[in-house]
Amino acid sequence: MKTYTCKNIRNIALAGHGGSGKTSVCEGLLYKCGEIERMGKVSDGNSVMDYDPEEIKRKISLGTSLAYCQWKDVKINILDTPGQFDFAAGLYEGISAAESVVIALPAKDGVQVGTIKAYREAVKRGKATMFVVTRMEEENSNFYKCLEELKTEFGPSICPIVVPFDKYGTVESYINLLEMKAYTYDNGVPTEVEMPASENRLKGLRAAMAEAVAETDEELMMRFFENEGEDFTEAELIKGLHDGIHKGYITPVVCCSGDTLAGIDMMLNTIIYMLPSPDETDGELCEDGTRSVYGSKDTLEAKVFKTVADPFVGKLSFVKIVNGTLAAGTEVINRTTGNLEKPGKLLSMQGKKTDDMIEAYAGDIVAVTKLNANTGDTLTASGDETIFAREKYPVPCFFKAISAKDKNDEGKVSNAIKRMVEEDKTLSYDHNHETHQRILGGLGEQHLDAAIAKMKNKFGIDVNVSDPVIAYRESIRKNVQAEGKHKKQSGGHGQYGHVKIEFEPCESETLVFEEKVFGGSVPKNYFPAVEKGLQESTAHGVLAGYPVVNLKATLLDGSYHPVDSSEQAFKMAAHIAYKQGLAQASPCLLEPICLVKVVLDDASTGDIMTVINKRRGTVLGMNPSEEEKGMTELDAQIPQAEITDLATVIRQITRGLGYFTAQFDHYEQLPQALEADVIANAPKYSEYEG
């Protein structure tokens, strides 16, 4: 396969709301460039980009897919990203590896939440942005309504490049505002036709484009205003648009139909002439805050931005080359781990199909076999100590407990999940040793459902799914004194231990043990046995068997037998006193309270606060979000038992814009009205046997 240098490469991430036509546009781009012989459809399950069995089944993209096309001696690497919010890892991967983000929105639906989220993520990372209005062939498509919505939502940077001329809801031709020419299409082949009569609207759009271009250059600005809106040449417009897009001043808008190929050629021209090549950007951010400019040195620097785990083929690493040359079989250093690695094959991806490559240059994206690298790792040549900054992914906020349906698969579950977490950085896995549950975390119900289905399809493991057990605690609310006597006679040698202990609440999470024994009623050599008996007893409370915290025990008195007393007997006596004492000390249940940070739009604040109050939460405060421009951060404390489905609720209220993170903060007393239900559903445990 032909190799390309930085200047002749464009890396674009296709993003947008779920169902916005991204994958269909990608099919159109590949077909128009001659990379595929026939166009597939998401609905038919035969598109180039959606090839995973779960994607075909669900008819949505679950992860980032990579393909390429070649147009006028420029290679365009296309990263098709998921539009569903549960699969945001794919969006982050795609944007991190691209210089430009092309955001699709359907002509019928206009700006949606996914449109806004994709734009915000692109701008946050300093990427060039472009909008493509899709599905222009559909009935009731309305490009100009979409254009007004884009201007309202994203401001004056919006600049149409290709617009339709429609009549009675049907597109009759596509207008290239750079050329001021109109085209009709037959299977993607353009034919120039006479410009439509609506000249005033088109002249207004052209003048707005010229003004936007004028603002990118002082000389052009002077000419524009001195000559009362003087128009520019096509070359000046292209250069001005290119510069403005790179600086973030201009966001171009084109329109097309992925299915009929109308306007696809003009979209391709916009990509190669106006979007930046890798070497025109500020470069890749390094861990130390500096940037490595694409194509600025000969030594290899590359980053792994995506990993695919396959039980048969092994690991496939998607790599973006920043500098130098990556060659198959040539040793590299993994700067993240410090290990020497030898790449296997270099592959140029066309969905699931591959072409072998001997080498690839700065700015290009390839897949590599036999790398023991993870997503976010940096690969360099010997002597180059560059380490690239790692992408920050959304934190899991939806959790389920899983267990193998076939007990023989129990040992395989952890290994399978480990492979999946390598592949998807928004999945998490934890083995909770207290509740003895394997906890799988993700971004939502659909996310975990797809992960569990993948576990079955890829690794052959079927699992049971349940809600995680809440790790409650028990404590006491008043001081009591209790006695425990363990006396047992069997044959010659008996057992005897007798203690009197005071139990009281305290602030310490672990047991506080003291002794105030006078006169030797309990010999000192048995004090450790009493303490150990109490320590072991606190593993289970008297209400529901949960661990006991905030407990102080003071050994006051007791008695012993010179022959029958032993450490074991005093341990048992302490346990008896513990059970009797705690039952009389007004025992209570404590529930875990989480510190929750909700990021939301201002319009949803009232509804979210109502939800928090209904879930026994307390709002601590609100501030403008530092990371999400135009959003608000709301801090609250909410019981862990009340946040099980909070991710779904927040997403519904905020229309997908909002999200939350939670971390354990402290324990609080469970309201008495809820105790009976918790006790009834508490997991069973084995009684202390000494």
Regions found by a protein language model. Give the residues of each.
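Structural and coupling elements of P-loop NTPases
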Residues: 1-690
